[in-house]
Every structure is written in structure tokens, then in C-alpha cells.
């Protein structure tokens, strides 16, 4: 039986990945794929910039004429051998003593800066000026005369440095008025509720001005950075805003200014960039940026007391209230991040700064006299805003952290066990009182459904319980007479862990772009607790799976939980018992 072999059918050539034609300059600058649409691509149309396409570009590669000129020049320079440098003798043989070379030795960073400054000023002569002002030839050993031209032995350092600076310069992003308004609205709709430090009327009054201070310009782009980060439509342009804002803030920090000249907008911009970096860059970068804001606050905001005068001009009250809110936002960020890292907080809770007023009073320019933090911690105090609730839970978080650090250093300072129990009962009493007051004002269904800020605060309350139990379990020995209290608190921590899992399951019903940006912090601490105390097949195992699944769903919007997720994955792959370690 004859077999018929079918000839292979011609296959269509794969479609090219890019459309024909050249990409526009804006897409090339941003390293994005251009759709090559005419007369404007979609990116340029959305950004409001001119769509410019350059088709005639200079040819690249080696240039024969230039190579010939360089070869002729080098031949001319080496055509006449001198007595000091015969052609058959290497320039750097074993008989040349290199120890006598007069190369500049850099003792510190200031010397290096001086050398670079001198090199730019003397690049035409090919010498480097030391601090003493003596010219040192680039590579000429002592007592020898070189016939090699300086132009070949010492490149133009100044021109190289200038070229690098030009490459690193970041142009101010240009966007249309429509996109600007959209980014402002996104910020106040999705970010301001978590960071209520901006007075909207004041912001828009200076934002629309053609001339702004450097600090205001940095704050504007920091706001747009966060606005773009919570928008699926504009997230591709947020990085250019971030780079421009950060470069401007670094330039401001490098200026030699007096201690009392820090602008409010400069501190606010650093805080906003820190939040963005925690979410989208990495923890270390965000922690350093937050530290810059903390130091600026410490320089000139914590001196004196917050007075009783409500008769000052309206603009003065608004600025003072913005400073209060900016400080308390930094205070909360400081304590929540310290809970994650285990490091001591930067700010003390004993500050003479009044609590922020209700949001309605703030935005409507209605001055009201608020109390201090000690007043809000009292058992019978009714708290008027979720921002103040956040400050209270941050304060108790800091006390729990300080309690643990004192226990770890107890052997060095001969701390007695009685001191531990006194501190624990003091913290636990205020924790129970404020947690009950919070639950009475905001029922559980309200915490789960309407307000991501309330959900975050509720998670933090229960995380403090887990934190206190871990401290007890590590410090109290098994033969202690109060070991029964440890067992009782373990039951309370198990219930708190289950409540955290229940609250976490509600995250799937929320828009991920509206979730509190620091939500991975309590979730990470809960995962560490469950990893430490779970046994295969027990109830903690199911809780661990649920909470890690929720964290994976938030992975796209926040980088804060990456390390603990990796820790969980490593735990699944290993059969050795888990040993606790600090995860940053």
C-alpha cells in the first residue's frame, strides 16, 4: 500500500513584535513600547506632550577616518625613540620603582571632592590638583620624562563627569491639566484618608500658582506619585513623578540652611515618598526616607509647647494644624514600622503637641481646642476621629515594643520578674480599655465593611495581643508561679489570631487599591506568630493558609509582606523545626 506523504503547508511568518516605523522620542525616553499611532501615540496624547518622531539618526559604529587619524597620531608620537624610553624596553618593567609615584592619596571624602573639583578646573592640562595645590602628572613616574601626550594618558575627567551629570538629570514631567486634576482627586479619594495631613483648599491654592517653592514642587509630585500608584490607568507614569520628587528633595537636603528653615511641604513630601517606597520600591529605601522626615521634624518642631491661643489668624491656625497632623502621621509610621523591625521608636510619646482636630473642622477652617495624648489614653475619653484612634493604637504598640526590649536587656540591668509583670499588667489594662471603647463605637460589622482605616486599626489591636504573648512566652520560665497567667493569655492570643484571619478574609471584598498601605504589617506579624506556634494539622495551620493567601493577593500593591511570605515558603520546603528570627 502506497503512502501519501503530505507536503508541509506553508506557515505564516510570525508577526513582528513591533509595528513598522520609529518610536517617538517620549516613548524612547521612558523606555516604553510605542504604538506608533499618528499624529500622536496614546502615551503622548495622555501625557499632553508633543509626539516627536525622528527618523534620520546619525550612523553608529566605528568611523574609518577617525581610526586612521588616531593611528597616524600615535605613529608620529612614537616614531622617535628617546634615550629614556627605548622602543624595545617596556614602559613598566620590573626595574621601575613604583613606590615613588606621586599619586594623590585620599584620606577622606573631602579630599576626594577636592580632587574632582580640581580635575574639572584643570582638565585641559591633564593634571590633578592635590589639597596642597601641587600639580601631579597623571601616570608619569618620578625622574622620567614621557613623550606620550597628556591627552592620550589622561582622559578629560571634567568632560566625563559633566556627561554623567547630564545623563542623570531628570526633566520635569509634563502632563495635561486633565491628568493633573485626576491625580489630585485620586490622592484625596484613596490616600488622604490614611494620611490626613493636607488641607485641600490650601493645597489647591498654591498648586495652581505658576511659581512654587522647591518644597511645594516636590510635594506636588509626591502627591501625584501616590495618586498614580493607586490608579490602574496612570500607574505607568508614576515612576517619573517619583524620580523627580526624590531628586528635588535630595537637592533640598543638600543645601546649607538654618535649623529653623525646614518647610512643612518638605517634611510632608518625604513622608509621602516613604509610603510609596514601602509599597512599590523596597523596605530599606522607605525606612531611610521616613528617617529623613523624622530628623527634619526633630530639628525644629519639638521645641516649646502647643499653646491655648485660638485667636490667631486663620492661616496661622491651618498651618499649625497641618504641622500637628504631619507630626502625628510620622509618629504613627515610626511606631508601626518599629513593630515590624523590632527597633526602638524614634519619637517619644511624651510630647507637648495637641492631638489633631476632627477632619470636618480641619477642612472647613473651624478652630477647636484639642487635648493631648495622655487625655486620649484615659479610660473614659471619647475619641472623635479615626486618626486619633490610629495614634492611640500606635502608642500602645510602642509600649508593647518597649516592654519587649526591656525584657531582652533585663539581664544587663538586673531587671526583676516583678518589673516584667508590673509593665505587662499596665499595658494590658490600657489595651483592654481602649480596645473595648473602640469596639463599642465601631461595631465589628462596621470595621469589616465600610472603612479600610477601621479595619487596619482593628488588626493592629489584635496584633498587640499576639506581641504581648510572645514576650511572655520568651521571658517567663516554666517553673514561674504565675505560669497559669501565661496559659490564660495564650488562649486570648489564639482567639485574637482567629479574629485577625476573619478580618483578613474581608479584604477580598474591598478594592485592593483602597486598602490601607500598612495592612501587611499586622498580617506579617500574625503569620510569624502562627508559624512559631502551629503544629501540623492543628487549627493554626488553616489560619496560616488563609492569611498568607490574603497577603499574596496584596502582593501587587505592597512590598511590605514579601519577606514573611518567603519565610512561609521556606517553612513549607523544610522539615526542620522553625526557629524564630527577626524579619525586616
Curated annotation (Swiss-Prot):
InterPro entries: TF_fung, Transcription_factor_dom_fun, Zn2-C6_fun-type_DNA-bd_sf, Zn2Cys6_DnaBD
Compartment(s) where it occurs, according to its Swiss-Prot or TrEMBL record: Nucleus
Known DNA-binding region: 24-51
Keyword Transcription set for record: yes
Entry GO MF terms: DNA binding; DNA-binding transcription factor activity, RNA polymerase II-specific; zinc ion binding
Induction data: Deletion of the conserved eukaryotic csnE deneddylase subunit of the COP9 signalosome leading to defect in protein degradation results in the activation of the silenced dba gene cluster. Expression is controlled by the transcription factor flbB.
Segments of this protein annotated with the region Disordered: 1-24
Keyword Metal-binding: yes
GO CC annotation terms, alphabetical: nucleus
UniProt keyword list: DNA-binding, Metal-binding, Nucleus, Transcription, Transcription regulation, Zinc
Stretches with biased composition (Basic and acidic residues): 1-15
GO annotation, biological process: DNA-templated transcription
Main location: nucleus
Functional summary from the UniProt entry: Transcription factor that regulates the expression of the gene cluster that mediates the biosynthesis of the antibiotic 2,4- dihydroxy-3-methyl-6-(2-oxopropyl)benzaldehyde (DHMBA) and its derivatives. Probably binds the conserved motif 5'-CT/CCG/AGA/CG/CT/A/CA/TT/A/GC-3' found in all dba cluster promoters and that shows significant similarities to the binding sites of other fungal C6 finger domain transcription factors.
Protein's recorded name: C6 finger domain transcription factor dbaA
Gene name linked to the record: dbaA
Amino acid at each position: 500500500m502506497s503512502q501519501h506523504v503530505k507536503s508541509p503547508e506553508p506557515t505564516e511568518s510570525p508577526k513582528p513584535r513591533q509595528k513598522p516605523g520609529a518610536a517617538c522620542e517620549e516613548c524612547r525616553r521612558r523606555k516604553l513600547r510605542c504604538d506608533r499611532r499618528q499624529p500622536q501615540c496614546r502615551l503622548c496624547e495622555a501625557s499632553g506632550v508633543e509626539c516627536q518622531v525622528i527618523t534620520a539618526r546619525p550612523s553608529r559604529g566605528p568611523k574609518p577616518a577617525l581610526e586612521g587619524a588616531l593611528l597616524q597620531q600615535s605613529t608620529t608620537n612614537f616614531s622617535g625613540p628617546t634615550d629614556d624610553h627605548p622602543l624595545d624596553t617596556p614602559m613598566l618593567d620590573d626595574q621601575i620603582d613604583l613606590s615613588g609615584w606621586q599619586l594623590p592619596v585620599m584620606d577622606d571624602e573631602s579630599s576626594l571632592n577636592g580632587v574632582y573639583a580640581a580635575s574639572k578646573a584643570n582638565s585641559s592640562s591633564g593634571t590633578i590638583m592635590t589639597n596642597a595645590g601641587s600639580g601631579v602628572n597623571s601616570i608619569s613616574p618620578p625622574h622620567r620624562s614621557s613623550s606620550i601626550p597628556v591627552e592620550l594618558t589622561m582622559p578629560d575627567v571634567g568632560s566625563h563627569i559633566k556627561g554623567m551629570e547630564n545623563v542623570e538629570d531628570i526633566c520635569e514631567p509634563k502632563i495635561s491639566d486633565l491628568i493633573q486634576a485626576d491625580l489630585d482627586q485620586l490622592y484625596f479619594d484613596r490616600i488622604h484618608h490614611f494620611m490626613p495631613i493636607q488641607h485641600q483648599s490650601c493645597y489647591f491654592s498654591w498648586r495652581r500658582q505658576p511659581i512654587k517653592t522647591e518644597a511645594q514642587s516636590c510635594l506636588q509630585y509626591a502627591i501625584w506619585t501616590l495618586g498614580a500608584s493607586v490608579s490602574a490607568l496612570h500607574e505607568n507614569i508614576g515612576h517619573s513623578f517619583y524620580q523627580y520628587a526624590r531628586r528635588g528633595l535630595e537637592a533640598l537636603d543638600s543645601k546649607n540652611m538654618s535649623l529653623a528653615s525646614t518647610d512643612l511641604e518638605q517634611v510632608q513630601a518625604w513622608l509621602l515618598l516613604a509610603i510609596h517606597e514601602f509599597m512599590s520600591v523596597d523596605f530599606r529605601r522607605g525606612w531611610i526616607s521616613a528617617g529623613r522626615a523624622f530628623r527634619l521634624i526633630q530639628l525644629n518642631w519639638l521645641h516649646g509647647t502647643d499653646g491655648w491661643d485660638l485667636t490667631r489668624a486663620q492661616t496661622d491656625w491651618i498651618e499649625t494644624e497641618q504641622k500637628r497632623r504631619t507630626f502625628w502621621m510620622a509618629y504613627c509610621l515610626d511606631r508601626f514600622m518599629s513593630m515590624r523591625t523590632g527597633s526602638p521608636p524614634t519619637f517619644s510619646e511624651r510630647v507637648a503637641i495637641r492631638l489633631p482636630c476632627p477632619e470636618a473642622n480641619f477642612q472647613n477652617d473651624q478652630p477647636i481646642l484639642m487635648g493631648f495624648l495622655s487625655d486620649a489614653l484615659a479610660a473614659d475619653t471619647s475619641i472623635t476621629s479615626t486618626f486619633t484612634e490610629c495614634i492611640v493604637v500606635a502608642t500602645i504598640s510602642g509600649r508593647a515594643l518597649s516592654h519587649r526590649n526591656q525584657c531582652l536587656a533585663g539581664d544587663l540591668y538586673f531587671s526583676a520578674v516583678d518589673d516584667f509583670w508590673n509593665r505587662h499588667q499596665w499595658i494590658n489594662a490600657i489595651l483592654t480599655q481602649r480596645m473595648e471603647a473602640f469596639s463599642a463605637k465601631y461595631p465589628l460589622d462596621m470595621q469589616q465593611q465600610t472603612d479600610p482605616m477601621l479595619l487596619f486599626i482593628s488588626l493592629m489591636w489584635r496584633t498587640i495581643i499576639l506581641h504581648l504573648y510572645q514576650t511572655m512566652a520568651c521571658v517567663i520560665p516554666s517553673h514561674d508561679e504565675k505560669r497559669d497567667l501565661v496559659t490564660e493569655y495564650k488562649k486570648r492570643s489564639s482567639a485574637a489570631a482567629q479574629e485577625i484571619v476573619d478580618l483578613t478574609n474581608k479584604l477580598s471584598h474591598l478594592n485592593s487599591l483602597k486598602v490601607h498601605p500598612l495592612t501587611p504589617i499586622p498580617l506579617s506579624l500574625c503569620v510569624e506568630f502562627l508559624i512559631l506556634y502551629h503544629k501540623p494539622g492543628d487549627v493554626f495551620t488553616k489560619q496560616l493558609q488563609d492569611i498568607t493567601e490574603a497577603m499574596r493577593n496584596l502582593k501587587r500593591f505592597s512590598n511590605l509582606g514579601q519577606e514573611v511570605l518567603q519565610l512561609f515558603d521556606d517553612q513549607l520546603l523544610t522539615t526542620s523545626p522553625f526557629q524564630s528570627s527577626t524579619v525586616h
